[in-house]
């Protein structure tokens, strides 16, 4: 138990030192740098050219879906690398756990595929045509 606490203590000390170094560097730079605000410094920079149009561009939602799926599988790899390093010590139960984990993510990928979120060019939905209504009989033709 004492060894576990000392290992967490080491991690905490490294975390604390990292925060102190980052905060110290930030505060030192903030105190030493000159402050000369200028409207040119806040303008949009496009490779040395004057900006044309608005900097706000609408992106298609498909980019978001592809990026989200990429992040999900990237995180999966982050979880599977440590598992792969200790696979021999964990035994077959760990293999089953990893397969279940990967299977759940693959089910999500199949769901996104079947739903059509991975199709880049989607067919445009066709609007069904209304059937022609028969001409109504005039009141003089009714019995």
Curated annotation (Swiss-Prot):
It catalyses: a quinone + NADH + 5 H(+)(in) = a quinol + NAD(+) + 4 H(+)(out). Its EC number is 7.1.1.-. Its main location: membrane. GO terms for molecular function: NADH dehydrogenase (ubiquinone) activity; NADH:ubiquinone reductase (non-electrogenic) activity; quinone binding. InterPro entries: NAD(P)H_OxRDtase_bac/plastid, NADH_UbQ/plastoQ_OxRdtase_su3, NDAH_ubi_oxred_su3_sf. It is a multi-pass membrane protein. Keywords: Cell inner membrane, Cell membrane, Membrane, NAD, Quinone, Translocase, Transmembrane, Transmembrane helix, Transport. The keyword Ubl conjugation does not apply. NDH-1 is composed of 14 different subunits. Subunits NuoA, H, J, K, L, M, N constitute the membrane sector of the complex. PANTHER family: NADH-UBIQUINONE OXIDOREDUCTASE CHAIN 3. Belongs to the complex I subunit 3 family. NDH-1 shuttles electrons from NADH, via FMN and iron-sulfur (Fe-S) centers, to quinones in the respiratory chain. The immediate electron acceptor for the enzyme in this species is believed to be a menaquinone. Couples the redox reaction to proton translocation (for every two electrons transferred, four hydrogen ions are translocated across the cytoplasmic membrane), and thus conserves the redox energy in a proton gradient. This is NADH-quinone oxidoreductase subunit A. It comes from Chlorobium phaeovibrioides (strain DSM 265 / 1930) (Prosthecochloris vibrioformis (strain DSM 265)).
């Amino acid at each position: 138990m004492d060894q576990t606490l000392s290992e967490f203590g080491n991690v905490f000390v490294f975390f604390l030192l990292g925060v102190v170094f980052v905060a110290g560097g930030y505060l030192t730079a903030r105190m030493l740098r000159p402050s000369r605000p200028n409207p040119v410094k806040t303008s949009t920079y496009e490779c040395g050219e004057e900006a044309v149009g608005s900097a706000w561009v609408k992106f298609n939602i498909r980019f978001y879906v592809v990026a989200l799926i990429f992040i999900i599988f990237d995180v999966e790899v982050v979880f599977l690398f440590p598992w792969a390093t200790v696979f021999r010590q964990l035994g077959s139960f760990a293999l089953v756990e990893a397969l279940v984990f990967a299977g759940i993510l693959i089910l999500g990928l199949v769901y996104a595929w079947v739903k059509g979120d991975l199709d880049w060019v989607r067919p445009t939905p066709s609007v069904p045509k209304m059937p022609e209504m028969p001409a109504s009989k005039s009141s003089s033709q009714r019995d």
